[in-house]
Regions:
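N-terminal post-signal-peptidase region of extra-cytosolic proteins
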Residues: 51, 81-91, 111-120, 232-234, ...
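Catalytic Cys-His active-site segments of thiol-dependent hydrolases/isopeptidases
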Residues: 74-85, 143, 285-288, 476-480
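N-linked glycosylation sites
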Residues: 71-72, 91, 105, 112, ...
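N-terminal Sec-pathway targeting helices
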Residues: 1-13
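Solvent-exposed beta-edge/loop recognition patches
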Residues: 58-61, 86-157, 463-465
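Charged, low-complexity intrinsically disordered terminal segments
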Residues: 23-50, 56, 152-255, 270-272, ...
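Bacterial N-terminal signal peptides
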Residues: 12-20
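A structural motif detector for short, solvent-exposed N-terminal "entry" segments of globular domains
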Residues: 27-85, 123-125, 147, 174
């Protein structure tokens, strides 16, 4: 049964490098994800790590409980129970992580563990109950849960109480001082293709869609010169996959490139909305899709960052491997069998170059991954604003959206706020209603806040960026939109940039102010991330570089 919701996704959030940490890889990788297990080292006694009470399979076949134990633990001394039943654990000597299942074969199909069988007298309630671990009748640990979502784990620790099996729980990763290159679209499409063309060893390519032939040309050329190329895309984008993309993916596969798509019954995330590439020891993170209207430079206003900070690149590569090397990543040749594809024209407009790529010194960079860690980080950034907040978004999910509420709270404490939304036909009416409400609220409460719809004036076709600039020196660049769908359903990355140099601030400002006040050359540039919800997941990443002298 698919978890996808049709209205979810006008955006493209996945990859914004913003705050992400080296997190565990999915089950089956060298390091297991915190999805199923906290740190196993240093456990003073047996503990419940997670429970899986509501399997997707009919009849809830495959319920399991994960525990951790000290080395050489005699499991026969322990029992597991709920509100109705207590069952003895197998008489085995075990260490570290142990998976206990009423149907080991079904559980083994989800995990790389060798589950131990327990009596099926223990049936976990979907509506919730306590799960109790006891030793010789004495309770030593307890995990409570309510309203178990289908196919998700209740975890004892981490950033979310519920998580899809195999989903990651990555911490925020911070990079030290260095230099990044910031660029705007449609002004500088060559940054993306030139980055791919420079590859000597590897390209790890992540996206929501891929329909730009120029990008495909560089991927094939890289493979021809023996560069390792891996591609990961969403398997079921809103509106369906296009014939153009299917043709490109056939071509990449024929060139020997490893192409995978995410989706299917075991999908950990409703969408893979990332937009990034790791080229050798550099990472490119953008707000735009790999298509003509996006990174191809033929339409959308967007932002991007290129960095070679080792911690950031390494963490993003780990995220890529975690997303690619699990069971919901399907080879393109397998996925395309029996599929139908949609026709869609490619954007072909041209626009002037107003903003050229610029190198910027960074004091610090943080990588965020959604749904793992991005929401709380972004709320903290907005909550700590003292001077200004500039927001540029395709759309916003409504008046009660958490980032909107945090921004209103900032305005109430005297922070000057500007919000610029897309005027594209598919979101204009909804955005205008929100703009009117925000301005009315600002007028009624005498808040330093103003909201507008963008007027492209020939500089671009539409806003597709997802950006926030705080206090003039911190920008978030990534694929996360400020709408409810993206907060709840996608996997993404984001990159946050902070600059205390006037020249650096100029580099990150021009793109927004040119749309806010055409007579003044003061635009800010940035992009934001999204939030995680227990019932819906979207894969995104974001980068937050703190730029300074």
């Amino acid at each position: 049964m698919s978890r996808r919701v049709l209205v979810r996704f006008v955006l493209a959030v996945s990859i914004a490098a913003v705050l992400v940490a080296v997190g565990a890889l999915p089950v089956g990788a060298a390091d297991r994800p915190a999805t199923d297990s906290p740190a196993d080292s240093g456990v003073s006694g047996p503990r419940i790590v997670s429970v899986y009470p509501n399997p997707v399979a009919d009849g809830d076949v495959g319920e399991f409980v994960v525990i951790t134990v000290p080395p050489e633990t005699d499991l026969g001394d322990y029992s597991l129970g709920d509100d109705e039943t207590t069952v003895s654990l197998p008489n085995r000597t075990v260490s570290d992580r142990v998976v206990l299942s009423t149907a080991p074969n079904a559980t083994a199909a989800l995990l790389d563990d060798d589950p131990l069988r327990i009596s099926d007298d223990l049936a976990l309630a979907n509506g919730g109950e306590p799960v109790v671990l006891s030793r010789n009748g004495t309770v030593i640990d307890r995990l409570n849960y309510t309203d178990a979502p289908s196919g998700e784990l209740r975890v004892a620790s981490g950033t979310a109480r519920w998580r899809a099996v195999g989903a990651t729980d990555r911490p925020v990763v911070t990079g030290t001082a260095g230099e990044v290159t910031v660029f705007a679209l449609p002004d500088a499409p060559a940054v993306a293709t030139d980055s791919l063309a420079s590859a000597d060893r590897r390209i790890l390519f992540a996206g929501y869609t891929l329909t730009d032939e120029a990008v495909a040309d560089e991927l094939v050329a890289a493979a021809d010169r023996n560069v390792t190329v891996r591609v990961l895309l969403d398997g079921d984008p809103v509106g369906g996959m296009t014939r153009r993309q299917a043709t490109i993916l056939d071509r990449l596969t024929d060139a020997g490139i490893d192409v995978n798509v995410l989706g299917g019954e075991r999908a950990r995330y409703d969408f893979h909305h990332a937009k990034y590439a790791i080229v050798d020891d550099r990472a490119l993170v953008a707000t735009e899709n790999w298509k003509h209207a996006g990174l191809g430079g033929n339409g959308s206003r967007g932002w991007g960052v290129v960095t070679d900070q080792p911690r950031i690149v390494r963490a993003l590569a780990e995220t890529f491997r975690a997303d690619t090397d699990w069971r919901d990543a399907r080879p393109w040749s397998e996925y395309r069998t029996g599929e139908s594809f949609q026709s869609a024209p490619a954007a072909n407009e041209t626009f002037p170059t107003e903003f050229r790529p610029r190198p910027v010194n960074v004091e610090e960079t943080r990588l965020l991954v959604a749904p793992d860690n991005a929401e709380s980080e972004i709320l903290d950034i907005i909550g700590n604003a003292t001077d200004t907040i500039d927001v540029e978004q395709v759309s916003i999910g409504g008046r009660r959206q958490p980032f909107v509420q945090a921004t209103l709270a900032a305005a109430r404490r005297g922070v000057s706020v500007r919000i610029l939304l897309s005027s594209a036909w598919y979101t204009k009416e909804e955005n205008q209603q929100l703009v009117d409400w925000l301005n009315e609220r600002a007028n009624r409460e005498s808040l330093p806040l103003e909201a507008r719809l963008a007027k492209p004036r020939g500089q671009f076709e539409k806003i597709h960026a997802k950006g926030v600039v705080v206090d003039g020196d911190q920008a978030i660049v990534g694929s996360l939109n400020w709408n409810a769908v993206h907060r709840l359903l996608y996997h993404q990355s984001n990159y946050c940039v902070w600059s205390r140099l006037e020249t650096t601030r100029t580099a990150t400002k021009n793109s927004t102010n040119m749309r806010w006040e055409p007579s003044r050359n003061k635009t800010r540039m940035g992009s934001i991330v999204f939030r995680r919800n227990r019932t819906a997941k979207i894969c995104d990443c974001m980068l937050i570089p703190l730029l300074t002298a």
